[in-house]
Amino acid sequence: MFEPTAIYAPNPHRYDTMTYNRAGTSGLKLPAVSLGFWHNFGDITPFDQMKSLVFTAFDNGITHFDLANNYGPEPGQAEKNCGLLLAKYFRHHRDELVISTKAGYEMWAGPYGLSLIHISEP
């Protein structure tokens, strides 16, 4: 599926300068800055540019990536590209990341474009 690549080695000091705040009473800590995938992770952005954005964010302690099912452009493409980036470069760092998404955008016409099945399928 993917061509062999060098293993991504993030900045070992990535947590030293970022401020982290507790999310309510959950105990979850989130960085003061998150990376939103709205416009820069769709079909029109070169994959190397997406990779550079994510590497720079993570190297600076940004551990929260924000997505939605309509982010692109083309709707849904940002989630797909995030999945590719996670699988290819962040497999060994997945436990350090918080990935959030939202649902509410109808992905296609018909009764299943915003169904529970669509929202919950991997």
Task: Give the location of each predicted region.
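Active-site-proximal loop and beta-strand segments within enzyme catalytic domains
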Residues: W108-L114
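N-terminal binding-site loop/beta-alpha segment at the start of enzyme catalytic domains
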Residues: M1-V98, M107
